[in-house]
Amino acid sequence: MKLQGVIFDLDGTLVDSEPNWHVSDTAFVEHFGGTFDEPWREQCIGMGSRAFAAVVKKRFNLHQPLEELEALKDRLYLDAARGHTKVFPEMEKLVKGFAVQGMPMAVASGSSLQVIEAVLKDTGLRPYFRAVFSSDETKNAKPAPDVFLLAARKLDLSPKVLLVMEDSQHGVEAAKAAGMRVCALPGVWPKGGEESLRKADLLFEKGPSEFRAEEVLEWIDRTYCQCDDCTLYEMGVCHDPED
């Protein structure tokens, strides 16, 4: 079966935004009198804006509506991110390579749509993507598969012909639960998350520093064929459903 679309996570995958999130999330937690320490930070990697706001709301017994808390979190992030968000060079090379091929691409992130659109516009990446999706549009955030399944429905593509690019444990779990292949480039290996990350179909263990667009494209050539109807592609041989 040939690859027919690629879904990218945003933060830590397409763009080096984790430093900005650390600054804004620290400010968000401190706004309510808390301390955003390292163990808590590791637990929240890949969690998504609304899910993180919900955790803070519960931990500090806050009475503000969840939407209000998420809006504050997003404002703090955009203040930190504008003009300070860099695209990972090899990931930009991969996106442009897919664009030349005419490959449909989308972004599916735990960030709000406002943040996704702002970051993609600020970095010049927005024109490459057919659509963007946020976990805010679904019932459950990653590690549930909801946002990836939403993307598949909107792109009108089967999960099995989609490849997900991810950096987090929650993201890999979500992609696998959606029935999609996933390439992982973890910037952080959270305690207890090693097993999930190693379930990625293609893994760059050292994260973005080790990631190479050319290796991904070569892996795709080995893993997928150009047929619409074969069910298996191994060692360069296509297998027909009737074989």
Enumerate the language-model features and the residues they cover.
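Asp-based, Mg2+/Mn2+-dependent phosphohydrolase catalytic module
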Residues: M1-Q4, K96-A99, S112-D243
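N-terminal helical cap/lid subdomain that shapes the substrate entry/recognition surface
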Residues: K2-Q101
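N-terminal start-of-chain detector that recognizes signal peptides
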Residues: V15, D25, L76-L78, P104-V107, ...
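Residue-level detector of anion-binding/catalytic polar loops
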Residues: T35, P104, R181
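Functionally critical, cavity-lining and gating residues within the transmembrane helices
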Residues: S49, S109, L113
